[in-house]
């Protein structure tokens, strides 16, 4: 079995090789603005999953996916030539869900900001319930300052 460090290094190298090959050698007009975001290799180094994103609408994504599938053989041979491993891993291209997840998170954050602004606007003229000074003051302070001389004189005269 191979260690995870070797698989990680091979995955990083596959990502770079596929991105460079798509940029330099693949001239398919269906291939749009494709970005290779990640690559993962199984523990036995036989299969590699390459994640990609495409800038554009669903039609351009489908066309780019078809172009990647048709260029899979050229990309695999280039990966085998540049990595020098005994068995060249088979490539599987998967659209990355990262942009969709990021868009969902941004929408949720926008909703939270809108609700915060709404609460802030509602609470601008509000006052807290209860007194302005909610703390109790000891009653002994008032009595000591008013009758402190009487207490001292009282027991002495009796």
Curated annotation (Swiss-Prot):
InterPro entries: KH_dom-like_a/b, RbfA, RbfA_dom_sf, Ribosome-bd_factorA_CS. Residues 114-158 are annotated as: Disordered. Its main location: cytoplasm. GO terms for biological process: maturation of SSU-rRNA. Monomer. Binds 30S ribosomal subunits, but not 50S ribosomal subunits or 70S ribosomes. One of its GO terms (cellular component) is cytosol. Keywords: Cytoplasm, Ribosome biogenesis. Belongs to the RbfA family. It comes from Streptomyces griseus subsp. griseus (strain JCM 4626 / CBS 651.72 / NBRC 13350 / KCC S-0626 / ISP 5235). Disulfide bonds: none annotated. This is Ribosome-binding factor A. GO terms for molecular function: ribosomal small subunit binding. One of several proteins that assist in the late maturation steps of the functional core of the 30S ribosomal subunit. Associates with free 30S ribosomal subunits (but not with 30S subunits that are part of 70S ribosomes or polysomes). Required for efficient processing of 16S rRNA. May interact with the 5'-terminal helix region of 16S rRNA. PROSITE patterns: RBFA (PS01319). Residues 148-158 have a biased composition (Basic and acidic residues). It is found in: Cytoplasm.
